[in-house]
């Protein structure tokens, strides 16, 4: 429910076109205006504010900002952002809010709240005329399931924004290379969806009768684990789950490990990979139901070796969606089915 999800056929139709892909003028202009506004302000901290899958998507921004710069950055779920009223929130803050529909009440209110504090506010949404976008000073809207190239969709737009922002906060030539190589994103998404299609189907076939599936990850990928757990397994498939941080696994959660307890482990490619490997080694000893998505095995064709760590998180959402599709296919439970969401007041 968070990453850009093109169907396999739609993606494969674009593979091998071999021409330089550029973002649409409208989208490029939106990002340029935001970056210009950032340059004019004395930004001292950054808040990423949203709910659910949108919050998970924004969390990659916080990961890269905190990893690459000394600018404090935070992730908040929208309602807590309002109720906690962070002391650091002021006219020197950048607040990025996101809602796919643009009408998530808590996030709309969070945008208004941040703007009232004098913060520079940026809204990200599918719909430019949504309530959320109307509350923020600046907007970024992305294309979705309309056969657009991925550079104009949510992942491409957000990563372009984040690396343009990094270039302002802590200039580095590698960010320019990331921005240039994002033109490969569409093709890489297609290739990795195809690469993991069999594994995803086998996952669905093997675990279709499981009532609980734990996910585990660290670094940037804990946000993918959270999204897969909350949005795909719990919300869409009604499978009990919990996203366990690999670094926290041995501080309590590992006691639930048993031969019949399923784990989906995301083996990351960043500095925290040793945490994932340690946890994986343990669950493999005691559980017969361990599946691994090894980020180092993704197809990174066209990406510089030293930039792969930045692209892994951009590709993993589409890969994990393949695993969810496998479960949906073999359980006969469509990902679109809801019991409560959008059907009643809550």
Question: What would you call each of these model-derived segments?
Answer:
Residues 44-175, 181, 266-293:
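Glycine-rich phosphate-binding loops that contact phosphosugars or nucleotide phosphates
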Residues 296-335:
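Structured C-terminal subdomain patch of bacterial secreted/periplasmic proteins
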Residues 223-290:
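Internal helical hairpin/lid segments
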Residues 128-140, 253-256, 300-309:
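Glycine-rich, charge-decorated loop segments at or immediately adjacent to ligand/cofactor-binding or catalytic sites
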Residues 183, 291-295, 313, 323, ...:
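Aromatic-enriched
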Residues 2, 6-45, 146, 163-245, ...:
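Active-site phosphate/pyrophosphate-binding segments
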Residues 37-39, 84-90, 253-258:
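Short amphipathic alpha-helix with an adjacent loop that forms part of the alpha/beta core around
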């Amino acid at each position: 429910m968070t990453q850009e999800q093109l169907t396999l056929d739609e993606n494969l139709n674009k593979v091998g076109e071999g021409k330089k892909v550029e973002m649409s003028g409208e989208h490029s202009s939106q990002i340029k205006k935001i970056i210009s506004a950032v340059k004019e302000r004395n930004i001292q901290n950054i808040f990423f504010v949203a709910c659910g899958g949108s919050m998970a998507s924004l969390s990659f921004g916080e990961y890269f900002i905190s990893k690459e710069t000394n600018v404090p950055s935070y992730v908040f779920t929208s309602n807590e952002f309002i109720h906690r009223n962070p002391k650091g929130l002021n006219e020197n803050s950048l607040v990025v809010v996101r809602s796919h529909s643009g009408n998530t009440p808590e996030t709309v209110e969070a945008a208004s709240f941040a703007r009232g504090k004098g913060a520079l506010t940026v809204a990200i949404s599918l719909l430019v005329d949504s309530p959320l976008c109307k509350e923020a000073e600046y907007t970024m809207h992305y294309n979705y399931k309309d056969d657009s190239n991925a550079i104009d969709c949510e992942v491409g737009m957000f990563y372009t924004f984040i690396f343009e922002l990094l270039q302002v906060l802590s200039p580095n030539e590698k960010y320019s290379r990331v921005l240039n190589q994002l033109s490969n994103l569409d093709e890489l998404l297609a290739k990795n969806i195809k690469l993991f299609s069999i594994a995803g189907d086998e996952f669905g076939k093997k675990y279709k009768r499981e009532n609980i599936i734990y996910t585990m990850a660290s670094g940037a990928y804990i946000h993918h684990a959270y999204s897969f757990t909350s949005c795909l397994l719990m919300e869409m498939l009604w499978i009990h789950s919990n996203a366990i941080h690999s670094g926290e696994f041995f501080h309590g959660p590992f006691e639930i490990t048993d031969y019949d307890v399923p784990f989906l482990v995301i083996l990351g490619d960043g500095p925290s990979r040793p945490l994932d490997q340690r946890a994986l080694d343990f669950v493999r000893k005691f559980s017969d139901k361990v599946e691994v998505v090894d980020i180092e095995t993704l197809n990174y064709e066209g990406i510089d070796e030293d930039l792969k760590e930045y692209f892994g998180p951009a590709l993993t959402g589409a890969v994990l969606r393949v695993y969810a599709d496998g479960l949906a296919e073999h359980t006969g439970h469509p990902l679109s089915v809801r019991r409560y969401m959008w059907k009643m007041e809550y």
